[in-house]
């Protein structure tokens, strides 16, 4: 019965995290990271804004995504949600790579603890990917047949 309660709590925690990812501000931040950030980070004025205090998160929406992953990493590190449940359906390392220059800047300004929970989450994700390089699909489960991929 205790295991059943624990599994229910794990599921509730994961559902809350997944719900957070669909909040408008978070979605906007991830859209910014995907579409605008790669060009914005090349602009000297945009990079300079990271050196001032406070940083405008309406302009630097990447900070919202970084805080999301920082919070999520803390939940995983403190066992509020099981890493396996989260890592089976997410790849935070893709965003870490894009955000590494910003994280390095924040650590230079504020110390090595800045975004350490985000880093923890990414290390766990990299370990997960090394453990399951072809995915985590059950070995004895049949696979569905897909049509040929779309071509140009």
Could you say what each language-model-derived stretch is?
Residues 5-8, 12, 52-63:
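Short, solvent-exposed segments of well-ordered alpha helices
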Residues 45-53:
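Short, charged, low-complexity loops and linkers
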């Amino acid at each position: 019965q205790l295991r059943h309660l624990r599994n229910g709590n794990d599921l509730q925690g994961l559902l809350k995290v997944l719900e957070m990812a669909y909040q408008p501000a978070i979605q906007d931040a991830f859209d910014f990271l995907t579409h605008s950030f790669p060009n914005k980070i090349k602009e000297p004025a945009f990079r300079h804004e990271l050196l001032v205090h406070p940083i405008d998160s309406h302009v630097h929406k990447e900070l919202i995504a970084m805080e999301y992953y920082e919070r999520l990493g803390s939940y995983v590190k403190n066992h509020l949600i099981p890493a396996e449940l989260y890592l089976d359906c997410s790849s935070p390392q893709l965003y870490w790579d894009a955000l590494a220059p910003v994280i390095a800047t924040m650590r230079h300004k504020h110390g090595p603890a800045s975004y350490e929970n985000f880093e923890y989450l990414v290390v766990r994700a990299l370990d997960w990917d090394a453990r399951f390089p072809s995915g985590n699909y059950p070995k004895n489960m049949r696979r569905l047949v897909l049509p040929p991929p779309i071509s140009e």
